[in-house]
């Protein structure tokens, strides 16, 4: 470091002008060298910076291209930076080393300096390079730090992305589960709503059931109350019934309620063993009428009728044929009383009111004519025919009027046999007295024996007459009913024909019972029983035909009841005229002769009856077609019956008329039956006034026998309850035919109960016919009186039982 001191010494030495010029030249050279060195340094720095920048850009691009090689890039970048830093340093040192000789040479050349100058220049350059190197290193460190931060950031970002994907997946799963839960929630909400609705409905039903329960409770209480009231009323009614029964027992009335064929309970009143007073006062009758239609009213009515019948029978016994007018008056009273009973139907009452003017005369005529028939019977048949007309007038009353006439007989029959016995005995006594006076044939039997035997006889001819006599009745019915319609003169002719035919009919009927009596003793009961068996066979033939058309008969009866009443009135007038006309009287001998003649032809008659039974069917059909022309029927039938000695035409016509009457109206039957009744009553004159009513009853029995032909056909057939009821008075009789006839009658009564008035009319007519027939056969063998009497009795009994059915 001696250079400055030497220089100063030199300057001091060179104070001369020359010395000064040299010094200036040296300073200028130094300055020029320093300026070049600065420029070189600046260029070096710029180049290094450019290289570093390019390296940085390249590194960044590499990092962005592959994240997986990020670590490698980082390492590579760090290496590259180190290399870059090394390179410039080497380059700088090399350049510096290279430039230094050139500068030094230039400076030296320019300055002409020495080694001292070179040394000073070297020191300044080394200081500048060290400073730049330090700056470069700092920059590299900053770059490395920046790269590290970037790598950490990228790793965090990647982790965030992974976690985000996981969260998204979890979110999706949560959303699905949430939707499922929402669906389940809606389902549960719906179920809750439905359950709430069901709960409301159940609550409503519960409320309704409670309300119904309350209503049922109230109803139950009301029913309980009504039940208690009804129990109380029932007890009261029971007590009243007991009192009524006590009163009935006190008065001797016994009520037997039985079920009729139609299902209704018919109160048949049997006043057994009780004998009522002989007379009924008006007060008692009014009381009985006021009782009403109840069973008690009917019972009292029946009792009154029974008493009336008993009174009539007793009076007839007391007042014989000599007091006929008196008996007629009593019968009229009975008829009037029976016409308006409380128990009768309103139709019967109306009809009785309509026919009231005829009742008295007709009833009187019946009994009067019956008495006359008893007296005149021994005398003549022509007289019988005339009386037949009178009896026809009697039979002419309306169906309704005839109904009350017969009930008296029926009720007397119901009295248990006591009244019937009285009445029958009365009739028997009358017949005996009259027969003693007229026929000189005394009764061989006591009243009891006559009663039973006559039952046999009576019922036998009833059955026989049921077929033949009843057919005759119906024939007369058809003739008279049809003919009065056309011409009154013709009706008179018909009446004459009836008289003639009635005489023949009585002969025929006499023949039948005579035939039965011929094998046995005429006065014995055996003959009677034989009669019963014989006629029963005849009846069976005739009955089936009648059985065929009961329904038609009922309908026609109702339809023609009105017309029949008018026809009957006309017939009555004509018959009354005929009745007035005197008739020659035949002696009893003539009658017997006629009967014997008929007996000879009995076999023919029976055969003809069988033929007639077949003819009836055809005749029934013909009559159904030609009901308006009964005359033609009668003519055709008469032609068929020509074989019969006396009454062939009448028989066939009668049988055909039976069927015709079934088809036609009961009213016509009543008219014709009434005529035949009168005719037969004349023939049976010995039966007496009582016989007329009983004959009517027998006619009822005949009608019943027709309808119930099956029961009559087998006389030994078991009896129905109705038959037992009817045969109560007849069980005393030994023969079963009687009971069978009663059975048939009772059954017919029940069947005909719908038209009681019509059945009664038929019964009246048929009874009169039967009584005439019975009286005729009785005359011949000498049993005339007992047979006629007991026929009347049986007829009365049967008629009464029938009327019981009709009343029910």
Swiss-Prot record:
Location of region: Disordered: 41-126, 393-415, 461-808
GO biological process: negative regulation of transcription by RNA polymerase II; regulation of transcription by RNA polymerase II
Keywords: Acetylation, Coiled coil, Cytoplasm, DNA-binding, Isopeptide bond, Nucleus, Phosphoprotein, Repressor, Transcription, Transcription regulation, Ubl conjugation
Result when mutating residue 68 to C: In a breast cancer sample; somatic mutation
InterPro entries on file: LRRFIP1/2 (IPR019139)
Polar residues compositional bias, start-end: 527-543, 755-769
Compositional bias of kind Low complexity: 110-126
Expression tissues: Ubiquitously expressed.
Gene3D superfamilies for this protein: 1.20.5.4090
Cross-link (Glycyl lysine isopeptide (Lys-Gly) (interchain with G-Cter in SUMO1)), chain numbering: 305
Cross-link (Glycyl lysine isopeptide (Lys-Gly) (interchain with G-Cter in SUMO2)): 606
Phosphoserine: modified positions: 16, 115-116, 120, 124, 555, 564, 581, 618, 638, 714, 733, 766, 768
Positions where N-acetylthreonine occurs in the chain: 2
Coiled coil: 128-250
Subunit structure: Homodimer. May also form higher oligomers. Interacts with FLII. Interacts with MYD88. Competes with FLII for MyD88-binding, even in the absence of LPS.
Domain observations: The DNA-binding domain is intrinsically unstructured. The coiled coil mediates dimerization.
Family: Belongs to the LRRFIP family.
Name used for this protein in its record: Leucine-rich repeat flightless-interacting protein 1
Organism: Homo sapiens (Human)
Gene: LRRFIP1
